């Protein structure tokens, strides 16, 4: 018999399965493979068909921290060139796209929008990946000059992982079903 994993109880179960021993920033990084950290992000926004993950950290970038609540999950990345928390990546049920421009998508199943607040002296803005049931917002403040490389490194580092693959992993490993 399979039991659904949902709400606070589901988050707690996945968190306890995912967090053992000492917790370092790298230990809480949601990597792009099925498992606890990614499952916790998925459960925070149960309608999201895609979940942000870190596929490979570029040279000069570090994972800072992860914050997960019901209805939202976010994490921060530090850069040796752009500073601490140079980028924030947030998963939510929806995004405010007012003033954003549709740009070429990088992920299958998602539309990408961009809104820039400043080009100089710092490159400041947000990129939005919008998909069924959710949105990932990338907020960044990057050093002008090397900003194009930093911007590309950020978007190369973060990918979108299919919720369905996570659900199958949890079902196979734990005998539990994700909500909804």
Question: Where do the model's predicted regions map?
Answer:
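Short conserved aromatic/hydrophobic patches within beta-strands of well-structured domains
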Residues: 22, 57-62, 154, 158-162
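Bacterial lipoprotein signal-peptidase II cleavage site
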Residues: 23-31
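Residue-level signal for mature regions of secreted extracellular proteins and peptides
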Residues: 15, 25-26, 46, 88, ...
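A short, solvent-exposed beta-edge/loop patch
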Residues: 109-180
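Surface loops and adjacent helix of pleckstrin homology
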Residues: 27, 66, 141
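Sec-dependent bacterial lipoprotein signal peptides
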Residues: 1-22
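Short, solvent-exposed recognition patches
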Residues: 33-125
């Amino acid at each position: 018999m399979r039991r659904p994993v949902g709400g606070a109880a589901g988050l707690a179960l996945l968190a306890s399965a995912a967090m053992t021993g000492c917790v370092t920033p790298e230990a809480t990084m949601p990597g792009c493979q099925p498992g606890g950290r990614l499952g916790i992000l998925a459960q925070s926004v149960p309608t999201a068909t895609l979940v942000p993950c870190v596929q490979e950290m570029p040279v000069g970038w570090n994972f800072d921290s992860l914050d997960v609540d019901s209805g939202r999950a976010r994490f921060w990345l530090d850069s040796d060139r752009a500073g601490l928390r140079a980028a924030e990546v947030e998963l939510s049920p929806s995004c405010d796209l007012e003033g954003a421009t549709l740009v070429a998508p990088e992920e299958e199943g998602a539309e990408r929008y961009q809104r820039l607040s400043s080009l100089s002296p710092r490159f400041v803005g947000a990129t939005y990946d919008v998909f069924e049931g959710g949105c990932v917002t990338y907020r960044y403040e990057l050093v002008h000059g090397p900003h194009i490389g930093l911007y590309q490194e950020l978007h190369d580092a973060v990918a979108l992982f299919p919720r369905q693959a996570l659900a199958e992993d949890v079902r196979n490993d734990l005998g539990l079903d994700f909500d909804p």
